[in-house]
Structure formats: C-alpha cells, structure tokens
Design a protein with these regions (language model features):
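Non-TPR docking regions that flank or precede TPR/alpha-solenoid scaffolds in eukaryotic proteins
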Residues: 1-617
Length: 617
C-alpha cells in the first residue's frame, strides 16, 4: 500500500511537470513547426506515463490520475490531428472505467460506452474527469465530421454544458487546497466546451444551409457565444449564405458585412459578397469586391482562425466538413486577378483591365510569385490568357503590344497544329486519319483556334494602324486555319454555347464560328478600304452567314452595296441592322472571339442622312 501511494504521488508529479511544461510551451512557441515537434514529444511522454499507470490493474484510487493522463494524451493527439489514436484511447478508457465499476462493457460502441461510463461515475469525484474526456470525444466526432454521433449525444452534450461549470469550479477549489495531489490538465475543459459549442454550430450550419430560418436562428445564437472573433465572423458568414439560399441577397450582404466588421481578415466574406453582386448584376460593386479580395489575398495567410491564448487546440481542427470547406474556399490571388481583369474589360473599364492582365502575366512569369505554382492550374491556359490580354490591349488602342502577345501565341502553337481537324459531332474531336480519339487530337482544335485568334487580333491591329494590306494578309491567315476544321452537320446550333456534358467542346465550336465571322468581316472591311468592293461584298456576306449577330459586317455590307449603287438593298440592310440591339461583351465566350469594334466605324448619323436623301424605301 505504501509502494502504491508512492507510485501515485510520483506519477502525479510527473504528469504535473509535463502538463505545466506543455502549457508553457503552448503559450510561448509561435513557430508552427517547432510547436508540432513539441506536441509530438509531449504526446509521447504522456503516453509513456499512461502505459506505466495502466501496467498494473485498474483501481479506483488511481482512476483520477489515469483519466487526467488520458485527457492530456488525447489533447496532444488531437492537436496533431491524430484523431484515430485519440478515439481508440478514449474508447479503451471508457471500457476500463466500467471494469473499475465492476460492469462488463458488452460493446465497443462509443455512444453506449460513454453513457454507461457516465452513469457509473455519477455522484463521484471522477464525474468531472469523465466529463472532460467526453469533451474530447465530442471534438473527435466533430473533427471526423460524424455529426450524427454528435446529434445522437445531444442530451449528454447539453448536460455537459450545464454542469461543467460548477463541477470544474469545485475541482479548481480542490486543486488549490491540494495542489501537489491533484493532476493538472493541459487544457481547461471549460475552454474546450466553449470552442466545441461554436465549432459545432458552424459545422452544423454549413450542413443545413438549405433548412432556412431554423438554421439561421441557431447561427445567430452562436454569434453571441464567447469565442474568437474569427469564429464569430464565420457564424455571420454562414447566416449570409443561408439567406442567399433563401433568395434574400440584400440581407445576405448585410451578414457578410457583419462578418467583415467582426474579423476584417475574413476573406471568404469578400468572395461571397462578390458572388452576390454578380447574381444581382451589379458589375461595378463586384469589381470593387474582387479588387479588395485580391489585395487581401496578397497579404500573409490569414484564412485560418487563430488559436485563443493558452489554447493548444486550433479551431481549424474541428472545422473539417466538406460543406464548410466549400463555403470557406476562396480562389487564389491569381485567379481573382484574372476574374478582375476580365470583368473590367467586359464592363468598359478597359484601362484597369489592361493593367490587371499585365500584372497577371508578370506574376505568372515570375518564379518568386507567392503561391503561383498552386494557382496556375485554376487559370486558363497561358495562350488563352495572352489572347485575352491582347484583346484588352487592342481595345485600349495599343496595337503594338497586342501584336507582341499574339506573336508569343503563334510561336508556341504553330509547330503543333494538325493538318486537319475532323469533328464528327459536338462531343467528338479527332484528327483526320487517326484511329482513335487521343488527348493530342482533342487538343488539336484548341491549339488551332488559339493560333487563328492570334492572327485575327493581329489583323485588327493592322486595321487600327490603317495598314490594309497587312490586315488582309493576317485575316487570310486566320481564315486559312479555320477552314482546316471539318465537321458534320448534326443540327447543333453554333451561335451560342450549349449547356450539356460536352459544353467545353460546344464552346470551341461556337468560337470557331465567331472567328470565321469576325475574320471574314475584318477582311471584307479591309477590302472596302482599298476599293476592292466585289471581294469585300463576298467576305461580308459570308461573315453574315457565319455570324449573323455581327454588327460591323451588317453595316459595312450595306456600305459596300451603297458604293456599288445598290442603294435600295443597302437601305434595307441598314434598317435591319438598326432594328436589332447591339450585343455587349459577354463572359459566355472568350473576349477575343467577340466583336471588339476596334476597326473603322461607320457614322450612324451619316448613314441616316444617306437614307433621308434616298427617300422612302
């Protein structure tokens, strides 16, 4: 008995020394790598101590110490995301508790074991230690996204929250009286309960966003909890997402604003706000949100909620559900910069768009750009980015810079172009003569379209420079590439992208038609500038067939007819053109495959004057 008492005191002292050192290191070590190394050491030391304690048969006198060491060990396991190890140890501990009480476990189901263990220690000094372990089991379930287990144990969780304060206060009073005999815990269970409560509310809220007002009420209640500001911000963020699902976008924006007021580093709130502005078609507000989001993403990483002072467990350990991760995900800084550039160009802020594109290309070329390697895969392919940037430069009246980017595209793709591309249907792309569809064959059309688009943009550049001969040459190069694509007519509309499983292939076919229409229109307009009117009329007519929505082709077709003294036909053509609205730039197709109105323009007032002089048609 004397030896047993000596062992108990020795083991208690060892636990207290380890716990004190662990708590001190947790507060003083800011380096995550060093912190992880120390956590591994502490969990190993606690586990060694636990094996010594469990090396002799379980006894009630040593149970309090054993449960404390189990708690400390499991906290260290959990801090290292070793949830399986923590759960196994917790299950074994619940079984040993029942052995001490003289009850046969009868099952390994954690819920049954914990209910039986709680019942066996009710009214005893071990009750608060078992409650502490139950906290950790709760955390493990939450970390492993086993929300059904948490929900099934809701009654016990409520009891835990209600009783823990009084029980642990009694424990602290007892600890002050017999500090050397009471095992120290590395983490105050009350802090753990507070952390788990709000993390549970956040995870459950993310899983139940579509349930409406009931979820919203729970999230609003959680927002009043004592918790780190980052977690409170998440409750506001989820409230906003819930309201967005309920088709209340303006109320959702208010919640996102609360999230940012609570924690200015909550970048996902900016991103969700941008999505709401896009839904509301408020392009200027969306651009502003994207600009701020990009600036924040360039700062050191602040996407994870910070640990509270003195807390060994990061909230991110318990926020691992797929639904929540999806809601909290934010595109990379480069992806946001690309979206910002495209939005600016499409919505008339061309100079800003150009600067964004140039910044993006510079970042992609810089080996030292933060996060660039992780972000590249989420961006369009580099030739497409060059073409988008080239289109923006063309709109900004910078033809020389546009041509330089197009030369880069042509140089990187020209030697890889197939001799011919045969498309059997919108979902099938193959090079003529090949026996099977290969990745190379599927990419053949894409590379051909990139090269053709580069020649098209260069034709536009020479048109801006009024070098009509070079413009005709480059438009012809574009057309010569496009006629290499052969396809069977299956009734598929090539004017707008389709929305089926082959949408990407459908977009490529739509781009093909647009490039045909635009290059024929460009060459026809260039022919008109050098008075080759018959050739101009032919190309403009073909352009109208390939791209009926083209405004420039229709207007210049009328102009050429007028010059050929077919004035009645010209008047009818212009009247039809004015009766149709001028389409604006769209995100449905690449910007370089849309009408940029960068070439010579016809004055509408002069055309109307001609019609008036002609008289009634």
């Amino acid at each position: 008995m004397i030896q047993s008492t000596s062992l108990l005191e020795s083991w208690t002292q060892e636990n207290n020394q380890l716990a004190s050192s662990c708590k001190q290191d947790g507060q003083n070590e800011p380096n995550p790598e060093h912190n992880l190394f120390r956590q591994r050491r502490w969990s190993s030391d606690f586990h060694k101590l636990l094996r010594k304690i469990q090396g002799i048969p379980p006894h009630l006198d040593r149970a309090q110490l054993e449960l404390s060491v189990v708690y400390n060990t499991c906290v260290c396991f959990t801090a290292q995301s070793q949830f399986d190890e923590a759960e196994l140890l917790l299950t074994q501990t619940a079984q040993r508790l029942l052995q001490i009480a003289g009850d046969a476990p009868g099952t390994s189901d954690p819920s049954v074991l914990w209910r039986a263990a709680l019942k066996s220690v009710t009214g005893t000094a071990l009750h608060y230690r078992v409650l502490s372990l139950l906290c950790l089991q709760w955390g493990v379930w939450l970390a492993k996204s086993r929300l059904n287990a948490v929900q099934d144990f809701q009654e016990e969780m409520s009891l835990l929250e209600a009783q823990s304060g009084a029980v642990w206060n009694d424990c602290r009073a007892e600890t002050k009286e017999k500090i050397s005999n009471i095992p120290i815990l590395v983490l105050d269970p009350r802090k753990l309960v507070d952390l788990l409560k709000i993390c549970t509310a956040i995870v459950q809220g993310a899983e139940r966003l579509t349930e409406g007002w009931s979820v919203l009420s729970a999230l609003q209640a959680a927002s009043a909890s004592p918790a780190p500001r980052a977690l409170i911000a998440y409750t506001h963020l989820l409230s906003g997402s819930c309201l967005a699902h309920m088709n209340r976008p303006h109320m959702a924006l208010q919640c996102y604003r609360k999230a940012l007021e609570t924690d200015p580093r909550c970048v996902c709130a900016f991103y969700q706000s941008a999505l709401i502005y896009r839904r509301l078609e408020n392009s200027q507000a969306e651009i502003q949100a994207l600009r701020i989001l990009h600036s924040m993403l360039l700062l050191p990483s602040t996407t994870e909620p910070a640990m509270a002072a003195g807390c060994l467990l990061s909230p991110s350990l318990f926020l691992c559900s797929q639904s929540l991760s999806s809601l909290l995900s934010v595109p990379s800084a480069l992806s946001v910069l690309h979206s910002l550039a495209l939005k600016c160009v499409i919505h008339g802020r061309v100079s800003e768009g150009v600067e964004c594109y140039l910044d993006l290309l510079a970042a992609l070329q810089s080996e030292n750009q933060h996060g660039v390697h992780a972000a590249v895969s989420t961006l369009p392919k580099l030739p497409r980015l060059y073409l988008e940037a080239g289109a923006a430069l063309l709109m900004a009246r910078r033809p020389a810079d546009c041509m330089a980017l197009c030369d880069e595209v042509i140089g990187s793709t020209q030697d890889l172009l197939p001799e011919k591309v045969l498309l059997e249907d919108p979902g099938d792309g193959r090079v003529a003569g090949s026996g099977e569809v290969t990745e190379e064959a599927e990419n053949g059309l894409v590379r051909l379209l990139w090269t053709a688009a580069a020649y098209l943009l260069q034709g536009h550049c020479y048109s801006q420079l009024k070098d009509w001969k070079q413009a005709v040459t480059h438009y012809t190069r574009c057309i010569s590439l496009l006629v290499k694509v052969l396809y069977k007519d299956t009734g598929f509309s090539l004017q707008m992208p389709c929305a089926d499983k082959d949408a990407e292939q459908c977009v490529d076919l739509c781009v093909l038609q647009r490039l045909k229409g635009l290059s024929l229109a460009g060459r026809g307009i260039s022919f008109a500038q050098i008075d080759r009117l018959r050739e101009a009329l032919r190309d403009l007519q073909l352009s109208r067939q390939a791209h009926p929505e083209g405004v420039s082709a229709r207007r210049w077709y009328g102009e050429v007819l007028w010059r050929l003294d077919r004035k009645q036909e010209a008047a009818a053509c212009w009247e039809q053109t004015w009766s149709n609205p001028i389409p604006s730039l769209s995100e449905a197709l690449p910007v370089y495959a849309q009408e940029l109105h960068s070439g010579p323009l016809l004055d509408s007032a002069e055309l109307h004057q001609k019609l008036q002089e002609l008289g009634p048609t």
